[in-house]
């Protein structure tokens, strides 16, 4: 058996169906989805893993759960939760799942069941219509959902309230340009982590956290961190540079990787290199008659 060189890498792009579904969904969604920091990172190393890590770790289908819940939050235009009544096939198309009318719809149903069991959503059955999904608080405690911007304004005089309701904003182009669909769960997780790290800073701000920080703050493994950063670089959302830690000291210079988010890239349709497949050629065994 002889292994040939890997085939040329092909570009994985969102399907036309997914892009059209995102454009249709944008009529109901916010210009920028709001997501609390507490969904992405824990405030203390001894706290349980944050909801983001729990979704990814919770068995098969983690990335579908994460992408689906983020999409639910995107479509919350009001300050309080608004019920969403769309068929599972529509959500499967938005997430660009295979066979959206059958297998994809079942994957959405499985994700909804997990999200309801873990108190991120409430599902209301409706006779003759798709089930209604009611979003609950990002903490997974079953509390009623209030948009973080509105909650922060309500508790403006409370320092504790301002901290609890700190949030990042995810541009609608994350959906309409197909980035949600082409990134894996690791890629989406690291995008959210970098958004939290960046805060309101400009795109020129250098971002850095160590593998230990990925686990301590975000509950993400080194594999997830490295895979996610690699994907973000491939789609052009992140530029990574090596920067000296002590450039002015008379010591051995140590360097580390720093990352720069480029949110302007969201204005372009997403594309990521698919993993190359190895083509294996099996040599035909000679029979006794064929032998020289």
Please identify what each model-predicted range represents:
Residues 1-34, 81-152:
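Eukaryotic partner-binding/assembly regions in large regulatory complexes
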Residues 35-43:
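Short boundary/linker motifs that mark transitions into or out of structured domains
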Residues 43-59, 168-180:
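Short, Lys/Arg-enriched N-terminal segment that forms or immediately precedes the first helix
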Residues 55-65, 83-84, 103-107, 179-187, ...:
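Short, low-complexity cationic-aromatic patches
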Residues 60-80, 182-202:
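Detector for short helical micro-motifs
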Residues 76-131, 199-255:
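Winged helix-turn-helix DNA-binding recognition segment
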Residues 137-178, 256-292:
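Short, amphipathic alpha-helical interaction segments positioned at domain boundaries
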Residues 165-168, 185, 204:
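Intrinsic, low-complexity N-terminal interaction/targeting segments
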């Amino acid at each position: 058996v002889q292994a040939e060189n890997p085939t040329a890498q092909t570009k994985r792009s969102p399907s036309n169906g997914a892009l059209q579904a995102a454009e249709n969904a944008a009529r109901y969604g916010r210009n920028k989805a709001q997501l609390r920091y507490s969904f992405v990172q824990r405030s203390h190393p001894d706290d349980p893993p944050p909801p983001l890590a729990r979704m990814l770790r919770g068995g098969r289908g983690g990335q579908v759960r994460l992408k689906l819940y983020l999409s639910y939050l995107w479509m919350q235009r009001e300050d309080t939760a608004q019920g969403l009544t769309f068929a599972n096939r529509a959500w499967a198309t938005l997430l660009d799942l295979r066979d959206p009318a059958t297998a994809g719809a079942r994957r959405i149903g499985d994700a909804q069941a997990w999200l309801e069991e873990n108190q991120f959503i409430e599902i209301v059955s409706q006779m003759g219509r798709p089930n209604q999904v009611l979003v609950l608080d990002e903490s997974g405690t079953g509390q009623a959902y209030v948009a973080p911007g509105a909650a922060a304004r309500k508790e403006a005089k409370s320092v504790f309230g301002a901290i609890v309701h700190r949030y990042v904003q995810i541009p609608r182009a994350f959906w309409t340009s197909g980035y949600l669909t082409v990134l894996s769960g690791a890629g989406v997780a690291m995008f959210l982590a970098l958004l939290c790290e960046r805060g309101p800073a400009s795109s020129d701000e250098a971002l850095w956290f160590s593998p230990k920080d990925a686990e301590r703050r975000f509950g993400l493994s080194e594999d997830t961190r490295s895979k996610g950063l690699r994907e973000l670089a491939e789609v052009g959302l992140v530029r990574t540079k090596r920067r000296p830690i002590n450039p002015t000291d008379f010591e051995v210079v140590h360097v580390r990787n720093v990352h720069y988010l480029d949110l302007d890239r969201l204005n372009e349709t997403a594309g990521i290199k698919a993993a190359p497949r190895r083509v294996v050629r099996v040599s035909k065994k000679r029979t006794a008659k064929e032998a020289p």
